[in-house]
Amino acid sequence: MWNLEGVIKTITQGTIFEKLTQQRQAELMAIPKTELAESIAALLTRPPAPRIPHGGVLSNLVYAAQYYEVFEAFDLPEQLRVFEPCVGASDPIIIAAEAYSDGQADYTTVNLNRTLREELQGKIGHLETSIHIIDDNAQRVLTHLGTNSVDVVCFHHAINDAIQTAVSEPRGMDTATVDWWPNERQMIEWMAEDFESGVIEKCGKPELMEIIGNAVELTRPGGYLIFDHWSGLVYRDVEWFPWELFCDLVPIARQWIEESNLPVTEIKLPDADPQWWMFLQIEN
């Protein structure tokens, strides 16, 4: 899975490429072929190297191609029903769903942060997929979507976002209105403090597990929860950044889920490192 040549083809002339705006297509095609291959290979490696050439153009397309292949591996329905909590301004899952279902997917997300929501909307206005952005907290998704109403829930770099929100709100940060990127360092530092002190068991873990529990209830039997995470090597030597914690977020979530007795079974896929990926199938 995620063969370099296959990913390059999907991004530069295949199903992902076809769903991009003309501007993004032009930016992509302007990259020399040798640099393109080297950069995509670097982005397929987790943790990714620092300062990957053309990373700003390629990163989300690589993630979209990876999710597209996961959808194929699980033989998900052509008219895919997707829920993504904590989407922020990130569009890889939406692009992957658009490509997989040829514009016939149904995608729902919950996004309280207004700045990130506006940034996301600016990226996806050209897509044909039915897209619903709910202005609410991810913990309240069951008031908007019914049981067994989706085929897959995608936690794309979402574990940290859910926990960061949970630890920041009690400290007085309004995560719905704050400018996310300039304040994310503070959120991450608070998260690290709470893991180190053990407070995370009372504030952080419960909120994430509620979101995951809701995702299980939303997903039809036989459907999937997909988790991925990464942390770029550029942050490894940054003094304030909790490198080891960020690298362990998927294993930490896996342990919490195992302790929860939720009706899920972990599925392994080739080439998907369990340090950075987790696939859970809803039991019948």
What are these regions (language model features)?
Residues 78-89:
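Conserved class I S-adenosyl-L-methionine
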Residues 156-210, 214, 233:
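Mobile active-site "lid"/loop adjacent to the S-adenosyl-L-methionine
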Residues 127-138:
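Conserved SAM-binding strand-loop segment of SAM-dependent methyltransferases
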Residues 89-104:
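Conserved SAM-binding loop of SAM-dependent methyltransferases across substrates and taxa
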Residues 113-115:
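Conserved SAM/SAH-binding beta-strand->alpha-helix loop
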Residues 105-111:
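Conserved SAM-binding motif I beta-strand of class I
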